[in-house]
């Protein structure tokens, strides 16, 4: 059914420009999706260039397999394991750029059968790879109320997390929920105050999705791995869509741009300081979509692109 869903790639040119493509370079698109970024990268590569794409969504893999290009290869798996994929190809330390477009994609949101949307009724799944791990329904049916409340508060930043968790557990005791519409209705009924600008299920659906897919852990691991796989001068170009994602990316780039921090008052020789190493990255700034892009694609409104460059440290 995926062919019915139109996907507009957010910050397409800006993210690829951020990679500073060399015609003979080796690049990674860690979130292939429907291939918008990958196709643009390929258009800028010469005959000797290479692109390794990664995605854990089987539908994205099916799209990627339609690209008949000897410079292109696709891996079915999470981008957190990019260091393994690179090592298997003997490319560690040779990657010239990594692009990550974080979060859920429009085709995933718009396909009711994937279970990501509270606006369309479908199976309560939410897995980016439906062949692995627990579905949202399975987790909500087996998790403790306190754990559900913590997830909703932590990953959804929802102040009524405890109320919602209690309502979910009580409903599942009566009859286990298996549909997105059922969960959305339970959440709405549990909310004592409604936000007129936001659907009551927005934050909880985000939280459950992040938890089911281990999204924030995936980002943290991929960022750590990037330091070992990037060549000196290699670029990181990362698009995030909500504050939890962007906070992780921003903190990582800031910390790696500062280098090791020595507490004040601790004497160290120049030789000792050198052993600590220098800055791993040079932060090159951030970009946000313009008014025209947001008008054409409202989902771009919250996106932030951050770019950094690997140093010689």
UniProtKB/Swiss-Prot annotation:
Keywords: Cytoplasm, Methyltransferase, rRNA processing, S-adenosyl-L-methionine, Transferase. S-adenosyl-L-methionine binds at residues 35-37, 55, 79, 101, 108. Disulfide bonds: none annotated. Signal peptide: none annotated. SUPFAM superfamilies: Putative methyltransferase TM0872, insert domain (SSF81799), S-adenosyl-L-methionine-dependent methyltransferases (SSF53335). GO terms for biological process: rRNA base methylation. It comes from the Bacteria. It is found in: Cytoplasm. One of its GO terms (molecular function) is rRNA (cytosine-N4-)-methyltransferase activity. Gene3D superfamilies: Putative methyltransferase TM0872, insert domain, Vaccinia Virus protein VP39. GO terms for cellular component: cytoplasm. Its EC number is 2.1.1.199. It catalyses: cytidine(1402) in 16S rRNA + S-adenosyl-L-methionine = N(4)-methylcytidine(1402) in 16S rRNA + S-adenosyl-L-homocysteine + H(+). Specifically methylates the N4 position of cytidine in position 1402 (C1402) of 16S rRNA. Belongs to the methyltransferase superfamily. RsmH family. This is Ribosomal RNA small subunit methyltransferase H. It comes from Klebsiella pneumoniae (strain 342). The lineage of its organism: Bacteria, Pseudomonadati, Pseudomonadota, Gammaproteobacteria, Enterobacterales.
């Amino acid at each position: 059914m995926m062919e019915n869903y139109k996907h507009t790639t957010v910050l397409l040119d800006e993210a690829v420009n951020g990679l500073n493509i060399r015609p003979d370079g080796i690049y990674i698109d860690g979130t292939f999706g429907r291939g918008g970024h990958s196709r643009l990268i390929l258009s800028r590569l010469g005959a000797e260039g290479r692109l390794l794409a990664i995605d854990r969504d089987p539908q994205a893999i099916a799209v990627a397999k339609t690209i008949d290009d000897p410079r292109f290869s696709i891996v079915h798996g999470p981008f957190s394991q990019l260091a393994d994929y690179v090592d298997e190809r003997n490319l560690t330390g040779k990657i010239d750029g990594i692009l990550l477009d974080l979060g859920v994609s429009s085709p995933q949101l718009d396909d009711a059968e994937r279970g990501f949307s509270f606006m369309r009724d479908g199976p309560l799944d939410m897995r980016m790879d439906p062949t692995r791990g627990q579905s949202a329904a399975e987790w909500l049916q087996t998790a403790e109320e306190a754990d559900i409340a913590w997830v909703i508060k932590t990953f959804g930043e929802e102040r009524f997390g405890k109320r919602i968790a209690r309502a979910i557990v009580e409903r599942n005791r009566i009859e286990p929920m298996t549909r997105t519409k059922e969960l959305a209705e339970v959440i709405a009924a549990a909310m004592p105050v409604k936000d007129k600008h936001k659907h009551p299920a927005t934050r909880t659906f985000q939280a459950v999705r992040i938890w089911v897919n281990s999204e924030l852990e995936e980002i943290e691991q991929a960022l750590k791995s990037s330091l070992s796989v990037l060549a000196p001068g290699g670029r990181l170009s990362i698009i995030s869509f909500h504050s939890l994602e962007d906070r992780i990316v921003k903190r990582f780039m800031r910390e790696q741009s500062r280098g090791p921090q020595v507490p004040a008052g601790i004497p160290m020789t120049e030789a000792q300081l050198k052993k600590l190493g220098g800055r791993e990255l040079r932060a090159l700034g951030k970009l946000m979509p313009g008014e025209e892009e947001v008008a054409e694609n409202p989902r771009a409104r919250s996106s932030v692109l951050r770019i950094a460059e690997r140093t010689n440290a």
